Amino acid sequence: MWVRTTITVKRWTEERSGRKIERTERTDITRLPSWKRGYPASVDSSSDLFSFSEGENKETDRRCWKHQHCPGHTIHPFSDCGHHNRCMHAVSQCDCESRCRSHRPVSVAIIYHPTHHMYMTDDDLEENWVSRKNHLSPSARPPDPNTGSATEVPDLSVPITIWRSESPIEKCQESNVIKDIKRKEKEQDEEEMVDEKANLKKKAKGKLTKKKTPVKSESSPADLSQSVRGPVRTPESSPESPGGLESEYSCERGKERPSSEDVVESLSPRKKEKTSSGQAKKNGTKKETQKTSKRKKSSPVPNPNLS
């Protein structure tokens, strides 16, 4: 609720000097609701905030400080706000505000007070007025048939606010800050996950490349089996064909040599032709020597008797 006070310098000085006006206006409390709780509007203010002067105006005495309070005009204490002994009245559904609009107030206090009214009995009023340190528990506001207008919807022209213990703007700002922090944390987590995945992929690629690197060419198992079978065949071959044995050994030696693709590709076609022609010549000469040896053995021996 917006709380408003209008005090003139003349009124404030009179209350500070003599309490005559205070006694006359204490009778106005009878026009308050039947429970008779709250502070009167004529209580003087101990604060020096209202001691400044903005010019004297004689018509200010006809404002709400002089009119008789209507049943809907309630007066509330605001001791919890730290504004002690300050005469304030809550603007509600009464015509006092319309009477004051034509006059400029000396000061206007707009105060955010706690979320509950602090009502006191008339007996405790004087004691608590002196000592503000006593804890005051909020009491429920009893209904009154005379103040039916107080519970109705107030006039739009009257300044009224909702009582809040915390500012909604600060809550919105805090929620926005929390959302920003959470969003940044999520982004950082996502970036870390992406980095971890990239590192794992790099490691897997490195392992694959290591496996694909060529190893030095060794004799294949087929070549080894052939080399083992080679000496086993040697006794089967006849002693009469040494050329055949030499050709078999030469073939086996050629097979036992490491055969790599790079060596085969490096050989030129001319070298291949020369090697093939050389091998053919060797085979031909060996065959001719074998034929001549057979002819010598098969030649008939001359019979001496026939001669």
Curated annotation (Swiss-Prot):
Basic and acidic residues bias locations: 250-260
Keywords for the protein's UniProt record, in alphabetical order: Phosphoprotein
Biased composition (Basic residues): 200-214
GO biological process: arachidonate secretion; mitochondrial protein catabolic process; mitochondrial protein quality control; mitochondrion organization; phospholipid metabolic process
GO MF assignments: phospholipase A2 activity
InterPro entries documented for this protein: PLipase_A2_dom_sf (IPR036444)
Disordered, as annotated region: 134-155, 183-307
This protein's GO CC annotations: mitochondrion
Similarity section: Belongs to the PROCA1 family.
Protein name per UniProt: Protein PROCA1
Organism for this UniProt entry: Mus musculus
Gene, per the UniProt record: Proca1
